[in-house]
């Protein structure tokens, strides 16, 4: 068995540089010399502690939002704060006999950026931290720095923000020329300049010279004093900049005094700063359509859902046909506030709680896991649609921003046409059995359908006694109302069989009824044999089929001759028809028995057929 070596990583906020960088410390060296086991000799299950130096603030995501300035994309590329630029400017002033510049807005201060980065490890030389902007908006800050237009602004809270430039030189010029030394540093610089000027005056008084020379020396003294003042001012100011002290601004902004310094990486927006903002409550929150006052979480969720729906409807052209191929650029991140539809807060606290509970239930219902069966039987495939809308909850995340790209892509994706549904195997078997039963019933009905074999069904006919019809025709009297037959037996419709066990004559003989639409009855021809009007029922013509197949004669004489001539052949036809009817009746009874057997089957019994076997193979 190979030895198992464990590793334990401990994150420490402050750790010595030696162990963090992997350098051997004296304690470790002494431990190794004392005979501690080497890595190859570590026993099984032993843990080794490896310290890792990592700041916890670096793990926190950056929630700052940038407000871009359209006029801040210009860069000069000239460093006027360098020593070479200042020396050239002084030489040019001496050449043309200019006095030293006393204007604080155009001071010559040499700044060593490498020294600044060493003194302040996390400094951002292209960014200036400003505090005291309680009543100022984003446009007010941009207009305040219009002489040095910045690139964008990062708001930290109601009282402070970071103003960012595209280069370090412009930010340094703005900080030095738009701010001054603190009051204590000014006093120190004045004291130093006064001491040096007093010493030089004493030296000048001790020297004896002519009046012309004194005048010239006086001019030189003035120049030297001014040079000394500039040197001391730059030295004190450089020390103040190295300490990164807050510098008061030269001009007021809306009656407030601003203070500025170089920003550092620790100057970040705190979590939940937007909810605690008094400026948003007083002047309106631009992230929510400029609404003033306290905004509840339910109101924010409704606002975000409406905003996303409006973006999908109005800006559908920005999203390609294939979602994900074209990137969606959100246009609400700029400074210009898009006019939004105000949403009034009509609900009270109780109604808001109810809505939050309903939304949580809806979200839980939307998050259900479902399984899709891709191959199903054709009878089971039904068009079902399901639309899922995901809502972003502001209470779960402290940041006020949303990933609009992700939300829009998820909403714009079409819902699947096939519904995803989880079913049990027993349900599938039962559905297959139902389909098989329905198909068997359809086959049995179609096979035993008499209408399809014989022909189209005649319109509903009313049967009456032939004798009454013949008597009425003869007497030219008004016909009686037809007698309704309650019996619907097939034997009455087809007539009696030729070898019927019943007696030929009875006290109340059953007479076969014929339709009133018979051709012979319409022509008024009596249908009787030579034996008499009331002959045996065996010799009578059968049913509706004979009346449909037989052709009526043009004259009465021809009709009587043809009836007498075709009497023996008609009996043979009747026997054939009766046999066919008997076969059909047997088939119908057999189909009923099959259906009764299928209905009595248990619900989980499986019948193997071609359709079921092919469906199972497709599913496998």
Curated annotation (Swiss-Prot):
> Does the keyword Transferase feature in the UniProt annotation?
no
Cross-link Glycyl lysine isopeptide (Lys-Gly) (interchain with G-Cter in SUMO2) position reads: 12, 70, 186, 541
Cross-referenced Pfam families: NCBP3
- Positions carrying Phosphoserine: 25, 73, 209-210, 415, 620
Enumerate composition-biased segments (Basic and acidic residues): 185-198, 366-388, 459-474, 511-521, 554-569, 585-598
Q: Which portions of the chain have biased composition (kind: Low complexity)?
A: 15-28, 611-620
BP-aspect Gene Ontology terms: 7-methylguanosine mRNA capping; defense response to virus; mRNA export from nucleus; mRNA transcription by RNA polymerase II; regulatory ncRNA-mediated post-transcriptional gene silencing; snRNA export from nucleus
Keyword tags:
Antiviral defense, Cytoplasm, Isopeptide bond, mRNA capping, mRNA processing, mRNA transport, Nucleus, Phosphoprotein, RNA-binding, Transport, Ubl conjugation
Molecular-function GO term, any one: RNA 7-methylguanosine cap binding
Q: Name one GO cellular component term.
A: cytoplasm
Report the residue ranges where the short sequence motif WLDD motif is annotated in this entry. 155-158
**Region annotation RNA recognition motif (RRM) domain: where it falls in the sequence:** 126-187
Chain positions covered by the region annotation Disordered: 15-42, 185-233, 332-419, 436-620
- State the compartments where it is located: Nucleus; Cytoplasm
Quaternary form? Component of an alternative cap-binding complex (CBC) composed of NCBP1/CBP80 and NCBP3. Interacts with SRRT, KPNA3, THOC5 and EIF4A3.
Describe its function.
Answer: Associates with NCBP1/CBP80 to form an alternative cap-binding complex (CBC) which plays a key role in mRNA export. NCBP3 serves as adapter protein linking the capped RNAs (m7GpppG-capped RNA) to NCBP1/CBP80. Unlike the conventional CBC with NCBP2 which binds both small nuclear RNA (snRNA) and messenger (mRNA) and is involved in their export from the nucleus, the alternative CBC with NCBP3 does not bind snRNA and associates only with mRNA thereby playing a role in only mRNA export.
Please give the name of this protein. Nuclear cap-binding protein subunit 3
**Which species?**
Homo sapiens
What taxonomic ancestry is recorded? Eukaryota, Metazoa, Chordata, Craniata, Vertebrata
Task: Name the gene that codes for it.
Answer: NCBP3
């Amino acid at each position: 068995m190979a030895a198992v070596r464990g590793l334990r990583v401990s994150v420490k906020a402050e750790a010595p540089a030696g162990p963090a960088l992997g350098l051997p410390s004296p304690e470790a060296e002494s431990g190794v010399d004392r005979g501690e086991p080497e890595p190859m000799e570590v026993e099984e299950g032993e843990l080794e502690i490896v310290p890792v130096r990592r700041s916890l603030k670096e793990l926190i995501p950056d929630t700052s939002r940038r407000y871009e300035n359209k006029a801040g994309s210009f860069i000069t590329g000239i460093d006027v704060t360098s020593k070479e630029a200042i020396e050239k400017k002084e030489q040019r002033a001496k050449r043309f006999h200019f006095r030293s510049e006393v204007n604080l807005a155009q001071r010559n201060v040499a700044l060593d950026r490498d020294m600044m980065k060493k003194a302040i490890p996390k400094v951002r030389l292209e960014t200036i931290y400003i505090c005291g902007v309680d009543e100022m908006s984003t446009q007010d800050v941009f207009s305040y720095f219009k002489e040095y237009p910045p690139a964008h602004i990062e708001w930290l809270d109601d009282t402070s923000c970071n103003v960012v430039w595209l280069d370090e030189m412009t930010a340094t010029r703005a900080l030095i020329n738009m701010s001054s030394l603190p009051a204590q540093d000014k006093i120190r610089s004045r004291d130093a300049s006064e001491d040096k000027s007093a010493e030089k005056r004493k030296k000048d008084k001790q020297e004896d010279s002519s009046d012309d020379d004194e005048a010239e020396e006086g001019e030189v003294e003035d120049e030297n004093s001014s040079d000394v003042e500039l040197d001391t001012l730059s030295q004190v100011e450089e020390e103040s900049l190295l300490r990164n002290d807050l510098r008061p601004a030269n001009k007021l902004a809306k009656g407030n005094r601003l203070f500025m310094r170089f920003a550092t990486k620790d100057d970040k927006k705190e979590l939940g700063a937007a909810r605690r903002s008094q400026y948003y409550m007083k002047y309106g929150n631009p992230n929510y359509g400029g609404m003033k006052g306290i905004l509840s979480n339910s109101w924010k969720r409704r606002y975000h859902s409406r905003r996303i729906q409006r973006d999908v409807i109005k800006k559908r052209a920005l999203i390609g046909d294939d979602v994900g191929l074209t990137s969606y650029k959100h246009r609400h991140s700029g400074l210009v506030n898009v006019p939004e539809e105000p949403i009034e807060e009509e609900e009270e606290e109780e109604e808001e709680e109810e809505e939050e509970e309903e939304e949580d239930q809806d979200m839980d219902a939307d998050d259900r896991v479902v399984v899709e069966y891709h191959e199903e039987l054709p009878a089971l495939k039904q068009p079902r649609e399901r639309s899922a809308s995901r809502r972003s909850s502001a209470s779960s995340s402290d940041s006020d921003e949303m990933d609009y790209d992700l939300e829009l892509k998820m909403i714009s994706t079409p819902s699947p046409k096939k519904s995803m549904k989880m079913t049990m195997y027993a349900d599938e078997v039962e559905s297959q059995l139902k389909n098989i039963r329905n198909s068997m019933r359809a086959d049995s009905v179609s096979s035993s359908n008499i209408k399809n074999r014989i022909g189209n069904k005649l319109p509903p006919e009313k049967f009456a006694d032939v004798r009454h019809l013949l008597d009425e025709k003869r007497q030219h009297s008004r016909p009686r109302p037809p007698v309704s037959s309650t019996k619907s037996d097939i034997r009455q419709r087809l007539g009696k069989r030729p070898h019927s066990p019943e007696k030929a004559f009875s006290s109340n003989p059953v007479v076969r009824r014929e339709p009133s639409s018979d051709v012979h009855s319409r022509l008024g021809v009596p249908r009787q044999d030579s034996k008499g009007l009331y002959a045996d029922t065996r010799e009578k013509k059968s049913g509706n089929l004979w009346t449909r197949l037989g052709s009526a004669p043009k004259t009465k004489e021809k009709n009587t001759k043809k009836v007498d001539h075709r009497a023996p052949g008609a009996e043979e036809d009747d026997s054939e028809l009766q046999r066919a009817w008997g076969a059909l009746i047997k088939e119908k009874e057999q189909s009923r028995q099959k259906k009764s057997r299928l209905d009595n089957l248990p619900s989980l019994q499986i019948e193997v057929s071609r359709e079921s076997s092919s469906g199972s193979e497709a599913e496998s």
